[in-house]
Amino acid sequence: MKVLFAVSECAPFAKSGGLADVAGALPKELRRLGIDARVMLPKYETIAPEWKKKMKKVAELIVPVGWRRQYCGVEELRHDGVIYYFIDNEYYFKRPQLYGHYDDGERFAYFCRAVLEVLPEIQFQPDVIHCHDWHTGMVPFLLREQYRHELFYVDMRTVFTIHNLQFQGLFPRGILEDLLNLDGRYFTVDHLEFYGCVSFMKGALVASDLITTVSPTYKEEIQTAYYGERLDGLLRARRDDLLGILNGIDDEFYNPEADPFLTATYSVHTRERKQLNKRALQRQFGLPEWDDVPLIAMVTRMTAQKGLDLVTCVFHEMMSEDMQLVVLGTGDWRFEQFFSQMAAAYPGKVGVYIGFHEPLAHQIYAGADLFLIPSLFEPCGLSQMIALRYGTIPIVRETGGLNDTVQSYNEITKEGNGFSFTNFNAHDMLYTIRRALSFYRQPSVWEQLTERAMRGDYSWRRSANQYKQAYEQLIKKEEHTLVHG
């Protein structure tokens, strides 16, 4: 079986969020299952020179973008057994950031078209094209409407994964004819029209053979008005083609036994060495090196989605507890300013790093006792799984993948691997933090919690098997349709 991942970012080459981690880890795991999984992404300016040196040009062609004819180079690189194809066009991709440009609609209209145009040139004919988020949303739609009649494409199936339904790729109506070579009949409710705009995300939801989300709970949530971002009706209509498959983490990269970024590596059998990382973390943030004071951490995008309004609401009440707090992240200016001010207001209790720093993030996962994720919504979330892998106990709101991966500790049955609260309410969060702190002060309970956390399986193995089954059923379904018509 052959599968092509069409993505807008992929670790370790280009990353702005969790999508890159998925695109970097899942194809590797699928290859271990015997699937020829390859990845296609733009060749961004920001890709490190050491990767660019390893690329070799395998094709050149012209890609139509409306009436324009744009150059397309294809460069190939092999890494960890996976073949990556980079779509090269300096006009579109020689930019300082991956996204956020005035012409993102044109950039990704070009990329979606290039994905399909390139395949015959590189002589790769996938059984399944697996697209991710709005940036590649037009691939399934263009395949269905403009390419499916050609012999080369006739048997190709499409899977579309929703990583975050909030970002939909909305553009003016004129993009249809001008950039996508689609006429006005496609600007209807049952095609691409979405409240007066063209929606790339909707194109994928309408045309893909299978739709997946990144956790079972998020799959259910997005079929409701509260989480559905005005697409819940369409998703309910396609519920028979909708799957929720939990993301995993790259357990080779996030491995406390061999992590090069840690002060001290450790395993489930040498958990006492975790304390060395805690002291190093306290030292790094200028906090007193107290072993018996619980250290809570957040590694987060500083946005309202991540529940930071809850934290700002009860911050001073949190600070009345005997605890320390470390925060790493960047995002909305108001949150950056708030946490910077709190670090100054509570010296010795609060440490803040504005920005993202991979080695420091690993040190935080290893050095903290508790990890706070109070998200408004969270399609999957990787942070809670990374924290669990490092024996750092998560405090989460019960939404999306957080609900699927963190089971709240039950003092009667002694089951659970973290702490959780249901309502998006600051004092519910505060109560849960206080509950977690009370169990931190019970060493026998805490030992059980950290051991259970570290023994959990958060890898891609289970998820990769589910994707393999989904691909196989899709191909089988198509063969059945062809035979029985």
Swiss-Prot record:
Pfam families found in the cross-reference section: Glyco_transf_5, Glycos_transf_1
GO MF term list: alpha-1,4-glucan glucosyltransferase (ADP-glucose donor) activity; alpha-1,4-glucan glucosyltransferase (UDP-glucose donor) activity
UniProt-annotated binding residues for ADP-alpha-D-glucose: 15
UniProt keyword annotation of Repressor present: no
GO BP annotations listed: glycogen biosynthetic process
InterPro entries: Glyco_trans_1, GS/SS, Starch_synth_cat_dom
EC number: 2.4.1.21
UniProtKB keywords: Glycogen biosynthesis, Glycosyltransferase, Transferase
Pathway annotation: Glycan biosynthesis; glycogen biosynthesis
Catalytic activity: [(1->4)-alpha-D-glucosyl](n) + ADP-alpha-D-glucose = [(1->4)-alpha-D-glucosyl](n+1) + ADP + H(+)
Cited HAMAP family: Glycogen_synth (MF_00484)
Family note: Belongs to the glycosyltransferase 1 family. Bacterial/plant glycogen synthase subfamily.
PANTHER family per UniProt: ALPHA AMYLASE DOMAIN-CONTAINING PROTEIN, GRANULE-BOUND STARCH SYNTHASE 1, CHLOROPLASTIC/AMYLOPLASTIC
Functional description taken from the UniProt entry: Synthesizes alpha-1,4-glucan chains using ADP-glucose.
Name of the molecule in the record: Glycogen synthase
Source species: Geobacillus stearothermophilus
